[in-house]
C-alpha cells in the first residue's frame, strides 16, 4: 500500500484493489471538472484552464450511443477517467482514446488499470479494430503506458498545441488488432 497525500493534507493508504471502475454518469461532472482543472491533468491534455462544470456536463451529454466513458473511483473520489469515442460510417471500426489520471494518483498504476479495462471492452464487446490517440511528445509516462498496450507511433504533429506560453508537439499513436 502507498500513502497518498491529498491537497487537503489528509493521508490515506492507497490500494489499487480499492479502485472501482464504472460507467461515467452525468452527476460525475463536478468531480471530473475538478480533476480536469488540476495542473498535471491539464498539462498532459488539451484542456484549457478553468473549465466549467457546465462545459464538462455538455460534453458528457453529447456522447454518441457507441461511445464508452468510464471512471475509476477510490473511496468515493474519482481518480481517473477514460473514454473511447467511436467514429461513424466507413471508419466505424476506429475509436479515439482519451484518458486522465488525478494528479495525486499519477504513477500508481491507475492508468494501467483503467486502460486495460477499456481495451478489453473495445476488443471483446465492441469489435473496435483501431484505437487512436494524440499524446504530447514530452509526456513520457503516458507514451510508455500506451506502448505497453501495443500502441505504436504513427507520426508527430509539430506545434500541435499551445501550452504554458509555447507551442508543443504531439505524437499520433495507434493500436491495431
Per-region residue spans from a language model:
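A short beta-loop-alpha structural element at the N-terminal edge
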Residues: 19-32
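Conserved catalytic-core motifs of GNAT/GCN5-like acyltransferases
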Residues: 4, 132-135, 147, 152-168
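Helix-loop element at the rim of GNAT/NAT acetyltransferase active sites that forms part
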Residues: 23, 34-48
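Conserved acetyl-CoA-binding loop-helix of GNAT-fold acetyltransferases
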Residues: 107-122, 143-148
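Acyl-donor-binding surface of acyltransferase catalytic domains
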Residues: 1-15
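Acetyl-CoA-dependent GNAT
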Residues: 6, 26-27, 45-104, 115-116, ...
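Conserved GNAT acetyl-CoA-binding A-motif
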Residues: 122-134
